[in-house]
């Protein structure tokens, strides 16, 4: 059963929790729906075996990944199920024929399938429909970051 820590009963869409049990079956199987997002990304083991309920998860929810696939570095993990990533890039200034450093911060939905996302990790994100006012991307893969490094670094 899922963790019930909200006011409304948490259940996965499309799963009947009141299903009749076949006679002679003793092992109770956890009813869970998951799918493959495609694009070469593997479904995390936590999404298959876990008990979390997240309607915005690309594996267990009703969100489709389409559009852009981007990479960024985790900056903040203080929100619930949402992280802030930083994307660094270079902008060319024609007057001086030089590049200047710029960056963008993006709010990204992080599924509970990724338990230990920390500051400095490199994440791959995929575009989806708008999930809130500022969130339009979902975390698809997490690579652990290397300890101390420069603040501006192109992957």
From Swiss-Prot:
CDD domains linked to this entry: Ribosomal_uS17
Keywords: Acetylation, Ribonucleoprotein, Ribosomal protein, RNA-binding, rRNA-binding
Transmembrane segments: none
GO biological process, one term: translation
GO MF term list: rRNA binding; structural constituent of ribosome
InterPro entries, alphabetized: NA-bd_OB-fold, Ribosomal_uS17, Ribosomal_uS17_CS, Ribosomal_uS17_N
Cellular component aspect of the GO annotation: cytosolic small ribosomal subunit
Key word Ion transport present: no
Domain of life from the UniProt record: Eukaryota
Pfam family, one: Ribosomal_S17_N
Family statement: Belongs to the universal ribosomal protein uS17 family.
Name listed for the protein in its UniProt record: Small ribosomal subunit protein uS17
Record organism: Drosophila pseudoobscura pseudoobscura
Species classification: Eukaryota, Metazoa, Ecdysozoa, Arthropoda, Hexapoda
């Amino acid at each position: 059963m899922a963790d019930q820590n909200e006011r409304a009963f948490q259940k996965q869409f499309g799963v009947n929790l009141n299903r009749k049990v076949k006679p002679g079956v003793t092992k109770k199987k956890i009813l869970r729906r998951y799918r493959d997002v495609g694009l070469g990304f593997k479904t995390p083991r936590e999404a298959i075996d876990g008990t979390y309920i997240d309607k915005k998860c690309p594996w267990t929810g009703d969100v489709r990944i389409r559009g852009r696939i981007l990479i960024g570095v985790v900056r903040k993990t203080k929100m619930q199920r949402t992280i802030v990533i930083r994307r660094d890039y270079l902008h060319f200034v024609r007057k001086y024929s030089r590049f200047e450093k710029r960056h963008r911060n993006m709010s990204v939905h992080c599924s509970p399938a990724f338990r230990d996302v920390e500051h400095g990790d490199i994440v791959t994100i995929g575009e989806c429909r708008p999930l809130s006012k500022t969130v339009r991307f979902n975390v698809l893969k997490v690579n652990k970051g290397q300890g101390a490094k420069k603040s501006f670094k192109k992957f």
